């Protein structure tokens, strides 16, 4: 169908340090599990790439101009399984994830993991971001809770570290936007904007 499909990056994912995240991965996982309990969910399939990156404090280059990576996370009360492409997670990141109780599986493994959930499991899925195949993988006897992801409001409320980093980024951006017109007015007759 598509003659020129974009190639997925082969670059490995990397960890976002606590100096940027402001909250440890284990604490975020605990907060999401508490939200799952509030919703009456036994399992939660995280499907939105930005939510996955935020929750695990990982970043990647799989999508142009967006620091996310392709993957899914199946979170239960006791377990967390990150499903990502082969080679996406290096040994150092793997060890860090394992220290926080996150196991790894193949990207396509999410469907089998969801199908293997026991009868009576209440699976939280955000229908706005979950793909059809995943929604159809929920086994008979399990209940799908099609609700907005609890990660969205958590991501929206910035902690003190995130707020300070946003201030710094806006300051740097403001300086760049202020300098550009000055540079533009000083162009010589033979120069173009591309020369800046």
Outline where the language-model segments fall.
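A glycine-rich phosphate-binding loop feature that marks nucleotide/adenosyl-phosphate handling sites
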Residues: 49-52, 128-130, 188-191
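Phosphate- and divalent-cation-binding pockets in alpha/beta enzyme and binding domains
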Residues: 54-55, 133-134, 179
């Amino acid at each position: 169908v598509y003659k020129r499909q974009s190639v997925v990056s082969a670059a490995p994912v990397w960890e976002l340090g606590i100096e940027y995240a402001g909250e440890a991965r284990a604490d975020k996982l605990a907060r999401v599990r508490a939200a799952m309990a509030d919703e009456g969910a036994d399992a939660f399939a995280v499907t939105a790439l930005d939510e996955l990156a935020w929750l695990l404090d990982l970043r990647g280059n799989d999508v142009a101009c967006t620091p996310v990576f392709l993957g899914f996370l199946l979170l239960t009360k006791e377990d967390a399984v990150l499903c990502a492409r082969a080679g996406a997670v290096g040994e150092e990141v793997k060890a860090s994830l394992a220290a926080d109780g996150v196991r790894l599986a193949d990207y396509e493994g999410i469907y089998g993991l969801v199908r293997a959930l026991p009868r009576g499991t209440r699976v939280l899925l955000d229908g706005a971001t979950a793909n059809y195949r995943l929604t159809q993988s929920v086994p008979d006897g399990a209940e799908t809770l099609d609700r907005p992801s609890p990660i969205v409001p958590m991501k929206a409320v910035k902690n003190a570290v995130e707020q300070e980093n946003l201030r710094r980024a806006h300051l740097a951006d403001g300086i760049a936007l202020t300098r550009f017109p000055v540079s533009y007015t000083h162009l010589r007759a033979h120069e173009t904007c591309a020369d800046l």
